[in-house]
């Protein structure tokens, strides 16, 4: 395995995050912070605690996972689609790099970027709502697993997309119903008695 190639692809993608810091890190953090302010603090202050858990604390995991899903897919799909669109992917394909090494580089960078955004959102949430994490190691494991899984899914979307419309419509058709169905089958929609 060519670790130099993996490292080169990984750091090239991480450098792209540095160049587009506002849209890749600050934008999702600010939009999620607005949810924490509106739903967690303002509306959550009017809802009584249920079994010692405030409404603001209750919505933090859902908002965190929703951001991780969308960021993992968009980071990975755009990361492979844009070089394909501009033609610079041929330089990577001409190099002595296996397909597995390309996947590890792109998906690893996408998962890292998404995890960074997730950790920043988690830290930001503590400013707006009272947050207590019961199992931090399990939570971190699930965050990493979610980032890797949906980064692989986004990489596949980026490979199969022919234009920018396909790049955006597939997550809209698949991820949005997935998130809505997870909300529907989860505990908030079931009676508690």
Q: Which residues are covered by each model-predicted region?
A:
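Hydrophobic transmembrane alpha-helices and immediately adjacent juxtamembrane helices
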Residues: 1-137, 141-186, 190
């Amino acid at each position: 395995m060519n670790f130099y190639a993996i490292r080169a692809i990984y750091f090239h993608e991480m450098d792209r995050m540095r160049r587009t810091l506002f849209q890749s890190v600050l934008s999702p953090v600010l939009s999620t912070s607005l949810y924490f302010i509106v739903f967690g603090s303002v509306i959550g202050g009017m809802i009584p605690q249920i079994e010692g858990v405030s409404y603001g604390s209750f919505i933090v995991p859902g908002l965190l996972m929703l951001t991780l899903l969308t960021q993992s897919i968009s980071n990975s799909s755009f990361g492979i689609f844009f070089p394909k669109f501009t033609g610079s992917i041929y330089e990577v394909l001409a190099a002595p790099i296996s397909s597995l090494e390309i996947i590890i580089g792109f998906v690893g960078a996408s998962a890292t970027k998404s995890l960074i955004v997730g950790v920043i959102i988690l830290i930001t949430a503590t400013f707006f709502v009272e947050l207590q994490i019961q199992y931090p190691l399990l939570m971190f494991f699930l965050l990493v697993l979610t980032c890797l899984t949906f980064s692989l899914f986004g990489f596949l979307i980026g490979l199969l997309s022919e234009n920018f419309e396909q790049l955006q419509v597939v997550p809209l058709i698949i991820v949005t119903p997935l998130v809505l169905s997870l909300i529907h089958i989860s505990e908030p929609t079931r009676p508690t008695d």
